[in-house]
Amino acid sequence: LTRAAGISLAPTFVAFTPWTTLDGYIALLERLLELQLVESVPPVQLCIRLLIPEGSHLLHLPGFKEQLLPFDPEHLGHPWVHGDLQALVARSEARRLPRREVFAAVWQLSHEAAQRPVPQLAEDLGSAIPRLSEPWYCCAEPTEQQLQSF
């Protein structure tokens, strides 16, 4: 409907929360493909992790604390243990890779982590949309690039 009206969507979401599973994450990637939104989603969006401040009640969730490092005042919260995707996206953005290429790398890494075959991506992943030079999201753990800019 919005495409037919010439309106570009730039969806935002927090990919990693205490309730995110690897299967759920892959399902999110599959949905972005189905909706042809790959070119509409900034690569950093694919690795955004919920900011967990000191004293958060979320730390009481069974098994969640094990996914975090101790509180780090420089990061304004508890850094998440799994940094693979964040490092991949940071390297890709530093190289100014197209969104399609970053998504393909995330797609492959995610499927490999789940020990699943990596399905080939379709040619049409959506159209490029107007965008800002630096996406920033509230409630998300800051990226290294954002921390260095202070």
Pin down the residues of each PLM region.
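Radical SAM enzyme core and accessory elements
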Residues: 57-150
